[in-house]
């Protein structure tokens, strides 16, 4: 429930009392009208009494003077505020009063039952002591159970976090394994598709380009060598022809 300041509560009380004081308002207004009519005579009498025998003003005259000075509209407005505040305070206090009355009724019924009950045996007294101990230990039990529930909640949260971290680590390892397998398969495919070339044993600077020739150059010393005889050359040609004939027969 919201805490209100004392001034607001007093204002509400005054405001709520206005509805119940309508008769009082009417009586006060009639009294003011009556004193306003008799006020000049009262003032003259008071002045003459002061000249002859100074006597203190009575409470009635003072009240008449005070009421004459009060404005009727402001008085009615204040009484209306009092009535409305009293109503609001009554609305606020009504649930509490009803709850307190119910508590008092339950307590009175319980006390009446305990008074009217006859003398009880020993085991009932022990049961009462046990119930009293349970009542005393109830806050400790509730605190312990709340601590246990909080620890269970913390363990569940920790397990969820650990599972999430393990899932992320497993995913990272799976990605690395897939990347490694892809690399191995790619290297294996390259190894079978493209033959490995051996590196040359000599450097590129040692390679010298030579002009292309369809026929080998005749060395000069061949001119000096003697030519074979004609019969030997004819014999070699015959041997070659016979070899070619045999190969043709075999192919057929």
Curated annotation (Swiss-Prot):
Biological process per Gene Ontology, one example term: cell differentiation
Protein species of origin: Mus musculus (Mouse)
Span list, region Disordered: 208-235
UniProt gene name: Spata9
Recorded topology in the membrane: Single-pass membrane protein
Pfam families: SPATA9 (PF15824)
This protein's UniProt keywords: Developmental protein, Differentiation, Membrane, Spermatogenesis, Transmembrane, Transmembrane helix
Protein name in the entry: Spermatogenesis-associated protein 9
Task of the protein: May play at role in testicular development/spermatogenesis and may be an important factor in male infertility.
């Amino acid at each position: 429930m919201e805490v209100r300041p004392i001034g607001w509560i007093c204002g509400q009380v005054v405001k709520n009392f206005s509805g119940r004081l309508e008769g009082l308002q009417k009586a006060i207004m009639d009294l003011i009208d009556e004193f306003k009519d008799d006020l000049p005579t009262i003032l003259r009498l008071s002045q003459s009494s002061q000249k002859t025998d100074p006597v203190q003003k009575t409470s009635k005259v003072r009240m008449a003077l005070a009421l004459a000075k009060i404005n009727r509209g402001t008085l009615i407005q204040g009484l209306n505020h009092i009535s409305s505040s009293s109503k609001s305070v009554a609305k606020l206090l009504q649930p509490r009063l009803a709850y307190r009355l119910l508590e008092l009724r339950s307590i009175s019924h319980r006390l009446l039952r305990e008074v009217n009950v006859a003398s009880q045996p020993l085991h009932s007294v022990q049961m009462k002591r046990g119930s009293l101990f349970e009542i005393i230990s109830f806050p400790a039990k509730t605190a312990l159970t709340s601590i246990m529930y909080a620890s269970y909640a913390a363990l569940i949260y920790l397990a969820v976090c650990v599972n999430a971290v393990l899932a992320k680590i497993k995913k990272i390892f799976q990605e690395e394994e897939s990347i490694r397998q892809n690399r191995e398969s790619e290297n294996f495919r390259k190894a079978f598709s493209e033959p490995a070339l051996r590196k040359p044993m000599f450097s590129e600077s040692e390679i010298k380009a030579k002009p292309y020739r369809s026929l080998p150059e005749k060395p000069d010393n061949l001119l000096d060598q003697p030519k074979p005889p004609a019969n030997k050359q004819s014999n070699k040609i015959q041997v070659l022809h016979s070899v070619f004939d045999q190969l043709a027969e075999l192919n057929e």
